[in-house]
């Protein structure tokens, strides 16, 4: 039987919210089988818990935000991406601020935290959501789609008019049966343009942004002295975001995702449309490990 997984130990980190600029204390705690991923605002009395599920998605303008009443938790996608990438099903995430810490702008530090805590199997079958038929949403020149595939694959295309972008680094297809999330995706950082920075700051956003937690581009070049971590780091970060958004389905996806110029808003619309189309998916478990798509085997997920 393919089993659910949680952390072996509690692990903590401190960081800054990229939009609020506020210091935040983060604690990851093991959770029982069938809990799912639960965010806990421990700075509130009483503590407010928000499950990482599609029906709690709120604002998606610059990040994916979860809301419950008037309580919000912003920028959840990078940590969720890390949890999906290494296969953690059940977890309590305590935080002392309305936004998760941005860390270095990627999922890499979260992967390190998870690996430091250790992962253990639980005595309950792991559930997957398997795509049975295509679901697609288009909006002008943007589109997102999921379709059947016996594995986990993401294709993504971006289109920026900038000297650093070309067709080689604006399109990527990653099949996770042969691609290591940890090595090839998790370290891709969020990026932004200096030309947008003034507008964003005027709107009291990106108050915690810096060259330490984002790739920043002027008209011609990257301002970060260390340059790119991957030749296609920009599009790989978009794929990192997609993996985090998809994990709001509450289960790992068996299927293929394709996106063109999409962001958190279109991604969330696709998730809602998918769940509303009952014939397009099914929940599956695997008693026989040999039937599990290779992308989700321990060998693939720990590479």
Curated annotation (Swiss-Prot):
Annotated pathway: Glycolipid biosynthesis; lipid IV(A) biosynthesis; lipid IV(A) from (3R)-3-hydroxytetradecanoyl-[acyl-carrier-protein] and UDP-N-acetyl-alpha-D-glucosamine: step 2/6
Gene3D superfamilies with a match to the protein in the record: lpxc deacetylase, domain 1, lpxc deacetylase, domain 2
Record keywords, A-Z: Hydrolase, Lipid A biosynthesis, Lipid biosynthesis, Lipid metabolism, Metal-binding, Zinc
GO molecular function: metal ion binding; UDP-3-O-acyl-N-acetylglucosamine deacetylase activity
EC number: 3.5.1.108
Residues given in the record as Zn(2+) binding sites: 78, 237, 241
Top EC class, one word: hydrolase
Catalytic reaction equation(s): a UDP-3-O-[(3R)-3-hydroxyacyl]-N-acetyl-alpha-D-glucosamine + H2O = a UDP-3-O-[(3R)-3-hydroxyacyl]-alpha-D-glucosamine + acetate
Annotated family: Belongs to the LpxC family.
Protein name: UDP-3-O-acyl-N-acetylglucosamine deacetylase
Organism: Coxiella burnetii (strain RSA 493 / Nine Mile phase I)
């Amino acid at each position: 039987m393919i089993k659910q997984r949680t952390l072996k130990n509690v692990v903590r980190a401190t960081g800054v919210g990229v939009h609020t600029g506020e210091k935040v204390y983060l604690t990851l705690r093991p959770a029982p089988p069938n809990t799912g991923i639960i965010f806990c605002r421990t700075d509130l009395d009483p503590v407010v818990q928000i499950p990482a599920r599609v029906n709690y998605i709120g604002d998606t303008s610059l990040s994916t935000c979860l809301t419950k009443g008037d309580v919000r938790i912003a920028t959840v996608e990078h940590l969720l991406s890390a949890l999906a990438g290494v296969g953690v099903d059940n977890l309590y995430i305590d935080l002392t601020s309305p936004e998760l810490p941005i860390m270095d702008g990627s999922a890499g530090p979260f992967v390190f935290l998870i690996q430091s805590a250790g992962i253990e199997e639980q005595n309950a079958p792991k559930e997957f959501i398997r795509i049975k038929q295509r679901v697609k949403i288009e909006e002008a020149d943007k589109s997102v789609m999921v379709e059947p595939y016996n594995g986990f694959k993401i294709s993504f295309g971006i289109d920026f008019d900038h000297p650093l972008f070309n067709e080689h680094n604006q399109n990527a297809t990653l099949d996770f049966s042969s691609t290591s999330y940890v090595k090839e995706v998790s370290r891709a950082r969020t990026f932004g343009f200096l030309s947008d920075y003034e507008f964003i700051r005027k709107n009291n956003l990106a108050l915690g942004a810096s060259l330490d937690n984002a790739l920043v581009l002027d008209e011609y070049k990257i301002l970060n002295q260390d340059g790119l971590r991957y030749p296609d780091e920009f599009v790989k970060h978009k794929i990192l975001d997609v993996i985090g958004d998809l994990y709001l389905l509450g289960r790992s996806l068996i299927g293929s995702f394709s996106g063109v110029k999409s962001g958190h808003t279109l991604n969330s619309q696709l998730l809602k449309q998918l769940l509303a189309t009952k014939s397009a998916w099914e929940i599956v478990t695997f008693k026989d490990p040999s039937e599990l798509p290779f992308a989700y085997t321990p060998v693939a997920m720990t590479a």
